[in-house]
Amino acid sequence: MTEFTLSDLEKIVATRARAAPEESWTAKLVAAGQKKAAKKLGEEAVETVIAAIGDDRKNLVDESADLLYHLMVVLNIAAIPLQDVMSELARRTSQSGLQEKANRQNP
């Protein structure tokens, strides 16, 4: 079992985002801007769904890794720390999913 975390990935993305675009895919994606990065995130999301439907475990693992990586890039460009997302998840999971959804729909 690996000890690699999403926090580790966030740090790697932040470091690589500061590199020269010709030296790093992450830097190239960041330099292209949020619209390009978000489009790539959407493509990876679709590929993850297709892998899930296809019942191909290895492909689903691979596409999920791509999806998480591209999410970290999008969050980096938006200057949203992973901790903000984790805090929101913690808040949402402190109650049932149905109650949380009702609260969002009726603030």
Swiss-Prot record:
Pfam families per the UniProt record, alphabetical: PRA-PH (PF01503)
Database matches in Gene3D superfamilies: MazG-like
Locations listed in the record: Cytoplasm
Annotated GO CC locations: cytoplasm
Listed transmembrane segments: none
Pathway(s) of this molecule: Amino-acid biosynthesis; L-histidine biosynthesis; L-histidine from 5-phospho-alpha-D-ribose 1-diphosphate: step 2/9
GO MF annotation terms: ATP binding; phosphoribosyl-ATP diphosphatase activity
Domain of life: Bacteria
Enzyme Commission number(s) of this protein: 3.6.1.31
EC top class, as a word: hydrolase
Catalysis: reaction(s): 1-(5-phospho-beta-D-ribosyl)-ATP + H2O = 1-(5-phospho-beta-D-ribosyl)-5'-AMP + diphosphate + H(+)
GO biological process, one term: L-histidine biosynthetic process
Keywords in alphabetical order: Amino-acid biosynthesis, ATP-binding, Cytoplasm, Histidine biosynthesis, Hydrolase, Nucleotide-binding
InterPro entries listed in its UniProt record: HisE, PRib-ATP_PPHydrolase-like
Similarity remark: Belongs to the PRA-PH family.
Protein name per UniProt: Phosphoribosyl-ATP pyrophosphatase
Gene for this chain: hisE
